[in-house]
């Protein structure tokens, strides 16, 4: 019973719950960005490059033989995933910049009175 109680306390701590929410939101955000790239950016980029569809770009290493499918290097999908990554990284970078601007700067730690007094005494003794 002690193990279950410890696990519940661990799982209900703010950091774990915050991380879980972040992972879920990040997953949903990744799907949105993937859709943005594959459904909006890639077709426009295809039109600009003369009707090329990146999803179909591949090198055929071995032709299909009977029931065995062709062996291919799908570099078009790789390009699409790189674009996904760049957009996600940029969005996260912008969010972090906004969060850092919104956060209040940490107040400078002031020295305790005794430490300040000793520093002043030291400085006075130095000057004599």
Swiss-Prot record:
Residues 46-74 are periplasmic. The keyword Transferase does not apply. Keywords: Cell inner membrane, Cell membrane, Ion channel, Ion transport, Membrane, Transmembrane, Transmembrane helix, Transport. Residues 1-16, 95-128 are cytoplasmic. One of its GO terms (cellular component) is plasma membrane. It holds the Pfam family MscL. It is a multi-pass membrane protein. One of its GO terms (molecular function) is mechanosensitive monoatomic ion channel activity. One of its GO terms (biological process) is monoatomic ion transport. The chain crosses the membrane at residues 17-45, 75-94. Gene3D superfamilies: Large-conductance mechanosensitive channel, MscL, domain 1. It is found in: Cell inner membrane. Belongs to the MscL family. Channel that opens in response to stretch forces in the membrane lipid bilayer. Forms a nonselective ion channel with a conductance of about 4 nanosiemens. May participate in the regulation of osmotic pressure changes within the cell. Homopentamer. This is Large-conductance mechanosensitive channel. It comes from Haemophilus influenzae (strain ATCC 51907 / DSM 11121 / KW20 / Rd). The lineage of its organism: Bacteria, Pseudomonadati, Pseudomonadota, Gammaproteobacteria, Pasteurellales.
């Amino acid at each position: 019973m002690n193990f279950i109680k410890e696990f519940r306390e661990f799982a209900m701590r703010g950091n774990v719950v915050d991380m879980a929410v972040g992972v879920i939101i990040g997953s949903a955000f990744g799907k949105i960005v993937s859709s943005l790239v594959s459904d909006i950016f890639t077709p426009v980029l295809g039109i600009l490059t003369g009707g090329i569809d990146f999803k179909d770009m591949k090198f055929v290493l071995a032709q299909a033989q009977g029931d065995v499918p062709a062996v291919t290097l799908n570099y078009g999908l790789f390009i699409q995933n790189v674009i996904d990554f760049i957009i996600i990284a940029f969005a996260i970078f912008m969010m972090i910049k906004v969060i850092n601007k919104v956060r209040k700067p940490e107040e400078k730690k002031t020295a305790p009175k005794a430490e300040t007094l000793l520093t002043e005494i030291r400085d006075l003794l130095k000057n004599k």
